[in-house]
Amino acid sequence: MNNMSLKFPDIAINSSESSDDEDPSSKNEKKDGSIKVVKGLTDEKKVFEKAKNDFDEALAIIDDDDFEYTKSEDDKVRRKIDFFILPIMCITYGMQYLDKTAVSYAAVYGMKQEAHLSGYVYSWLSTIFYLGYMIAQYPAGYLLQKFPISYFMFIAAFLWSACVLLMAACSNRHGLLTLRFFSGVFEGCVNPAFVALTAMWYKREEQPVRVVSWYAFNGVAIMVGALLGYGTGHIKGSLQNWKYPFLVIGAISTAWSFVYLFFPQNPVLARFLNAREKRIAVERVRKNRTGMETKKFKPSQALEAFKDPQVILIVLYNGLCQVTNAMSVFSALIIQGIGYSGINATLLTLPSGAFAVAGMIASGIFTHYFKKGRIPLAMTTSSLTIVGSIMIWKIPHSNPWPRVVGVWLFCTISSGNAVILSLLSSNISGYSKKVTVNATMFLFYSIGNIVSPQLFKAGQTPEYIEGIQASLVSVCLFEGVLALLAFYYIFENARRDKLLENNPALGGEIKNEEFLDKTDREQIKFRYVW
């Protein structure tokens, strides 16, 4: 690893040491509970002019005076952010998951037969969605950096909802495949945007719980979708039954998209915060050393992303993890194949969501009380997916209920994925690097999801055992990748501690370094959480 050199600042004054457990900026917290912020850059006008280009937009409200705020003020701002920002993210994440899995409910009500979808074409409904998702990643990352996130999300949410609605008007595979492709393009904007939002609004130690919170709405969506699917199956209207899930879910999503017209672009522009609270919101994320938002794209940071070992391991993990994701589309069909009717099979997917949400809650509690151990936690929750896979595969057909429970256990994989996703917001610094890593991460997410449904072939019906076996192999492989990632973080933190111990001058104070849009590899004081 000697060729993985770090670029550290040449300027060093007031040298100080840093450890894996303490960020140097934490020394600003005083005994009376107030928090003192060091002075800003002295050439204020030049900084404000460059904030819109080279540096972070947070500098626009950081003046040259000492700024202090109390712990109670910090908590008040956090509660406001939780009240105004987090629910919108949670519901949106649930809606996008509900939208993309609507085909699962339509399938058990005759869509495959009435729209003339052979087994391989149905698999392509999932594959082509993620082809669109993959194509969208780098353009979405670029647009996310250039335009207000509120309008970006409104347009994306409105257009993917429209695609879901229009699927009810289709009568053949060509229309369905086309709309699934464009639905994937627009839904592909959500994950990169939400990772960026989490890093923008929350402290590093707060991020895992918030990522788990909005990611948990995948599980909520599974439960809501099961009820909607069950309900729409009883509609006696003039349309074919399989079209109603698209109409109901698409209409709800379209209405929800308009919420983003009122969504703040960043803490500096948040209307629900007063001037002092905006400054506190900015200072809250100073210790993260990951910045807030910068509009200028920096190619050097993008290049660094492709050379960073942690990025390589994270994207490899994500690709392997998503190989298991076809279960979201095939779960109702697998349960139907175990021996339950279409309507009952749809209803029996509801506990899958409950298991996923329970896993998320447990993960959130763990990360709240234990500041380290995100990767071991993800490895532990993923082991439940291994158990579920073996139950579906090995338990005799004469014993259907344990096999259904295996399907439910399989879905706990999402809680581990959410925990690893929080590493993106915590361990990647430099805004251009961040959007590049997010795009690359979800490009591999797309590749895994493109491969996944092709492993569930028509010849495997009704139980898709070979697809389950392939998923099992994938989980075992990414467990190994996670072990390597944990080792890398521990090694790199120790190496930086040693560098500071041997060269104390490297730890010198650089005013507002946290908002100078430096990458994690350019900051010797940066420590990786694992």
Curated annotation (Swiss-Prot):
Residues 24-33 have a biased composition (Basic and acidic residues). The chain crosses the membrane at residues 83-103, 124-144, 147-167, 181-201, 211-231, 244-264, 323-343, 346-366, 375-395, 404-424, 436-456, 471-491. It is a multi-pass membrane protein. Keywords: Endoplasmic reticulum, Membrane, Transmembrane, Transmembrane helix, Transport. CDD domains: MFS_FEN2_like. It is found in: Endoplasmic reticulum; Membrane. The keyword Calcium does not apply. One of its GO terms (molecular function) is transmembrane transporter activity. It comes from the Eukaryota. One of its GO terms (biological process) is transmembrane transport. The keyword Transcription does not apply. Gene3D superfamilies: MFS general substrate transporter like domains. Its main location: endoplasmic reticulum. Residues 1-33 are annotated as: Disordered. It holds the Pfam family MFS_1. PANTHER family: MAJOR FACILITATOR SUPERFAMILY (MFS) PROFILE DOMAIN-CONTAINING PROTEIN (PTHR43791:SF70), PERMEASE-RELATED (PTHR43791). Belongs to the major facilitator superfamily. Allantoate permease family. This is Uncharacterized transporter C460.05. It comes from Schizosaccharomyces pombe (strain 972 / ATCC 24843). The lineage of its organism: Eukaryota, Fungi, Dikarya, Ascomycota, Taphrinomycotina.
